[in-house]
Amino acid sequence: MAENLSDQDCFEKLSSSKEGQHWFCSGLLTQYIQPTFFWFAHDETPSFKWVLNAYHERLRSCTSCIQAYYELRNESLAKGSYSFTGFSITDLQEKWNKWDIIRVLEDFKALEDETIDFTSLPCLIFETLLNPKLFTCKNIYKNAIDAFNGLLSDWCSNIFLPGYLLFFYEASHPDVLEWVHSFFKENTEIRISSATVDAVFNTVVFESQNSSDSDCNFVSISSPEFWERTYMFLELLPLQSITAACESILKDYLLNLVKTSESLSSQQMSCLRICCNSSSFWSAADSFKEVSSFLKNLLKNVTATPFEVSDMNWAYIIASFFRTCLNDFVSVFPEWLKGFVEEKRTIGFIIYSVLDALFDLLSLDYSSPSFLNNTLSLMNANSITILQDYPEYMLKLRLHSLLYDIAFISWSHKAITKNPSFVFDPSYELSPFWKLDNLQEEKISDVLFSKISSCCFAHDIEISENSTPSGTMVQFAELWQVMSEYISGFLKGFSEKSSTEISNMLGDSSKFDTVVSFLLSPTQPLYVSAFHIVQIITNCTKNRNEALKKLVAMDFRGIVHGLADAVLNWQSILSFFPALRIMRFLSITNKSLSSDNSAFTENDIPTLGAYWQCIWNILDLVFSNVARWSLNNPADTVKALMKLTLKFVDDLFQNDGIFIKLLAKFDSLILLGETSESLFSFIMWLKINDLELRGIVINSLCKLFTKFSNFDYLFEDRTVTFLTDFIIRKQKAHLSADQCKQLANVLTQASPEAKTVLEQHRLSEMRKTKKQTELTNSAHVIKPSPTPQITVKQNTTKSSSAPRMGMLEQLKQEYLTKRNFESKLKSSAVSSRKPTFNEVKPANLLAEDLSDNEDDIDRKQGLFSLAKANKIPEIRQQERRQVQLLSNSTIKMHPSQIRMMTNRNVANVKARLFPSMTDFYKEILSWEPANQSPNPVLKFHKLDGKIIDSFKTVEHYMEVLQPMIFMECWSQIQSTKLDLKFSPVEGIMVERTAVNNFVDIGVSVAPKDLYGYPLYDTEVVSLAFNKEDASSMKGLCCFAKVERIVRQTNGVLVVLRTLPSMEILNKLQGNCALWFLKLTNLATFTRQYAGIRGLPYFHLADDIIRARPCSQPVKHSSSEIKAAMKRYQVNEPQAKAIMCALDNNGFTLIQGPPGTGKTKTIIGIISALLVDLSRYHITRPNQQSKSTESKQQILLCAPSNAAVDEVLLRLKRGFLLENGEKYIPRVVRIGNPETINVSVRDLSLEYQTEKQLLEVNQGAIDLGSLQELTRWRDTFYDCIQKIEELEKQIDVARDVAEDTKSLGKELQNKINEKNLAEQKVEELQSQSFTKNKEVDLLRKKAQKAILKQADVVCATLSGSGHDLVAHSSLNFSTVIIDEAAQAVELDTIIPLRYGAKKCILVGDPNQLPPTVLSKKAASLNYSQSLFVRIQKNFSNQMCLLSIQYRMHPDISHFPSKKFYDSRLEDGDNMAEKTQQVWHVNPKFTQYRLFDVRGKERTSNTMSTYNLEEVEYLVNMVDELLNKFPDVNFTGRIGVITPYRSQLHELRRAFKVKYGKSFMSTIDIQTVDGFQGQEKDIIFFSCVKSYSKHGIGFLRDFRRLNVALTRARSSLLIIGNMETLKTDDLWGSLVDDALSRKLVESPHIDSEGRLITISRTSEKRMKNEEFVEPPSKKLANSEPSKEIRQRS
């Protein structure tokens, strides 16, 4: 022990410990540290100095050690105060405090001098917040305050309450005060000790008294602000913490003011008023004489001016004093008042004001109402007349009096029920106000009607037949008789109002709850009065059941709310007679629900869920308490309740019942989990001795088990164990063979473990029977071998031949026999069986382990023989449980296992988010820049074949797809080399560092050379020793990756990572000139590589490699789909897609053909996930959900910025909730602000971060600089938008051979303006943010906070892999990807790295696929999306959005038939909605093909064009414009073609025909460039004509689908029909148009057939390499009739 250790022993042990060992928090050296706290009593020795230094080192680096140090020191010195005699303990404490101050001050100075690491700062702040005494040092005070102010969000912990309280009195940092105030406001359950308050007040008082010697800026205790600050934190504390504060020196300060001051300030009065709520503020030692002077001064204001009823603080302060001495209030206070108050009315008012306050304070203490009996003697008819002139106060007093009676009756009934020997004052009299006629006065009636329900379950106390009621019971019965008559009369008076008036009043839920409560009352007059009210509002006076059914139909939600409140009230007494009434009420309610459950809508589901919870709570109470009730109530009545309950349970699960349907609406396991307690209580009824009831119990139990098993319910271990034991001991349980078999059958189906145990027992019994047969001559019975889990002893006691006792007799005797057997039972209660199924012994339940002796008692005494009849079970008053999933695990893991699992999870997350990228950069940086071959040379990755439909292992998947990244990257670099947009930049090499296998080269560059030269740390550049080599990438040149960019005062340092050859490395000498040229950005490729390297740790890894969607799609009923259609305002296919996305895990595929509302569906899914998913967390009506589930965050992605921003625009508008309110989710857009749509730029992370910084840190940022920064940033964005417009204009001008010099000059001016703006933004950001480390840290924290608070985070697929997202510890369980069919597979897996368990892919595989530059990669299926790969494997598990709202039916006819198996339907009235005036002209109808047999030509770029088609198309447009001059066609006409050369010719022709200005009214694009757009009229030029190479580009069915689905009202196709018919796909298009007589051609014969005039024999061609979309591969489709006939 520490007492026996010498100083030398302690020193040697401490000095021999390992370096860096944690001495305090580990607890290993406690006994050696404790004696050192007394060493300050002696002169300082070298040993002690060494120990102090060691302490200092450990307290500098570990917050846990700091906390343990103070606890250990205080504990040691406190113990030493009794035994240590060498020194004053107070002096010792003071010496340690001084050492702490010196130590902490040294560390702050060392931090400032940078002699210790910055990481010590948190420990210093931690200690100062923990120990307020440190604030007495002015330098510590200043440093700690400043540091805390800069890092506010890091210190949200109750550990620092001493420091937080101290900050309430800090005067120089209002922002700290505001933060601490917010912390207390948000954390409403803060617990503060009196010691904490003492420490804070001592510090503040010390500083106040020594203000001249201190720079610490605490408010003075003598100033009004001190009490204002005290009130500020007191009003935020719960009562428990106020009580603790009243046990501190704060109470002494206040009492001193009360006893010495003539008056108190308003701030002091406010503090005193709050403290008076605590019963510990005044003590019995505080005499009336001591405070009388204060009370007299307090009452001066009351007597001097007309009193106001509203301001009653003075009354509460006086009442708080008399709370501890009620006798003085009765005997002393009135006489004392007469000494200085003359008016009798004023005396009466003061007395009744204080009496009124006493009611409130005593109820706050949860005191017995009988404590006020003496004060009630003041309330008599004579004294009441004093207040007749003050009706408002008289009304309040009257209500208090009435409510007091209600509280007294309710409290007395509970007290006597729990303790029959309880005695209360028999002199109690009910209020005289009950006899007045004005109880129906609105102000009284409203309050009284809401409160009387608390005594609805009061009734005569239940006693056994042979017992004699006590005097208390008789007195209560008499009192209740009178009270019930009063209440009944009040209810009858209420029922005399008009039915309309009653209905309006019952619209208040509290009043409706009262009616429901009295419908459950066991007191007949009250029940009758309440029922009369029901008859009036339902207009049903004859049939009681019909009236109740109508009530349920009228307000089911109110019924459930009232029932729940009534049951909570009943739980506090759990008497028998209310149970009968409750069960009858439930039976009627259920019949009403089951008779017409079609009336219930989706909105009623939460209420039904709450009702379900309420039902099983009631059943649990009935099952658990029947044993106790049977002791004091007639047997027939108890049996009637049991039969009623059993029938009710059976009826719950009728096949057509409401709850069978309810289980399908929710996760059935969640709802059935509510039944676990009830089910275990129910199986105790198996021990009943009544044969009839036992049979009913077994049948009911078997039905329940069967129903639950159908829903895969996991029964609790204790339930299964009890039933298994019970079946094995069937003889002692009095079970017949059939009953055993019946129970065993359902049990084995429900539990495999039980099946194993019962089978082993059966085999054991067989061996036992055989053994006994062999030993017939033996004098004893050999015990059978034990079963593996349950040991069964052979009972040698012969059963009694006496007839079995009746149930009632047994239940009566149980009370007596239980005492006789109690000691015996205790000794035999230790079961010989082993625990089974992870069994945890239930606490305080009716059943215990079944020993032999207990079984004998069971057999003799029957039902509930194990209940402790002499002890009423404690009333369960727990808050109603929320619905939770049933936990399968009941075993606690060993701490080492927990640590291992935690470490493994952390490692997995790290591997998933931050895989090694070394091989990626090795591969790219090893490439030769001069190499111009189409494919790279791969040194570190091996090409391993095509992407197949399904992979078996992650490793194989990675081996195949990783090389695709490098082939695409190589192609990107080669493409950039052909069209260089930048020139090389010159710099000087200033540093060279070896990093692993790489060489990092620091190049110093002049800032002006980087203006307008966007360079990021993900760029790859060519690096050479001269400008020519860097540009041509020949000679001594290598690739380099930009590692980081450091802006310095004398230039910019660009650090380049390289893998140079020896020749280059040898030439890289100090200060040599280097040139680098920006080539391409590697961001997407690095994120793809990081994604695939982390794939083994993805939740969806197996689904990705096997390309499979959710394994078992959930089926939805028609009613659910209709409800979803109404909820989200969508059509049926969209509703199905939303529900599938909501219910399925894994991948969900939604195919959205053109115009079918993909975006609207996505918004519906987000709405369902963010808002409506809460319907699975059932709470009582009008009760706030307390779900502790983590925040649901959604990651929304798409391949392009435009697609992301399109959905974002819709999200920005918000969506409607079920109650009609608008909900706007918190949305954050991640990405380069340059690429984000202007309309949603305010949702960008950058914008929101700066906005938040401005709001929370105004003092740290110069407002002028910030405004200038905003102005330059706006200029930057405006320039980007203008540059995009100018580039489009130049593109068009070039096509029409127009001079672009002026446009080019304007473009260059805008580029220069943009570069200047970018330079200014960087400079201002550097000045405002990066120079201020604290603000820069706040910026990063703000970004993380914004991301964590977001409901939806939006980004491109590549952008979702941004490092900021990875480092923000975000977990997106749901990912939604729009346009998923346009993304390569490796892009799709990037957003899945954040723990995704649900991924919703939305797209259309029948439209254009992703663009892949590498022909080699494309040939290996790299251009195939993950969407398509999954579709190939599971085509029947796609949700098809099958209703289009874009095209006229004539236009949609062929795409629907050919590409969507005729399943693409038209929306309502689409023909009328798309009808246009030009349709009257037969040439410009909704859909038509024009046969133009021109000549195909090839341009220099090997692109095809057809001038005849150009001419024909221009003339058509001209004719359209001339024939309909009144129609404004601006922006309504689109011209598309598959070939870029044809695009140029078309633009040139229109320019010649109409001039330059016309080009802004018509949109001419390639088919690929027009995807995602739509126009009223589309002219489609096919180009191909008599080609030797077929129709080429046109053959891709996806391109054709895009082309045919862009038009809303008219689609006009111009092409050579003869050539087009040579292709199988296009031929079907021409044949379809011919059959519909929609082809205009001079080459059609009289029978409507196309005449062939080709000079070459052409046969219809079918592309062998590209397969047309088969009908079988459509979403959720079956083979068409045509296909089935062919097969």
Swiss-Prot record:
GO terms for molecular function: 5'-3' DNA/RNA helicase activity; 5'-3' RNA helicase activity; ATP binding; ATP hydrolysis activity; RNA binding; transcription termination site sequence-specific DNA binding. Its main location: nucleus. ATP binds at residues 1134, 1155-1159, 1407, 1445, 1574. GO terms for cellular component: chromatin; nuclear body; nucleus. Residues 788-801 have a biased composition (Polar residues). GO terms for biological process: mRNA processing; rRNA processing; termination of RNA polymerase II transcription; termination of RNA polymerase III transcription; tRNA processing. Its EC number is 3.6.4.-. Keywords: ATP-binding, Helicase, Hydrolase, mRNA processing, Nucleotide-binding, Nucleus, rRNA processing, tRNA processing. It is found in: Nucleus. Residues 781-801, 1661-1687 are annotated as: Disordered. Monomer. Belongs to the DNA2/NAM7 helicase family. ATP-dependent 5'->3' DNA/RNA helicase required for the expression and maturation of diverse classes of non-protein-coding RNAs like precursor tRNAs, rRNAs and small nuclear (snRNA) and nucleolar (snoRNA) RNAs. Directs RNA polymerase II transcription termination on snoRNAs as well as on several short protein-coding genes. May also play a role in transcription-coupled nucleotide excision repair. This is Helicase sen1. It comes from Schizosaccharomyces pombe (strain 972 / ATCC 24843).
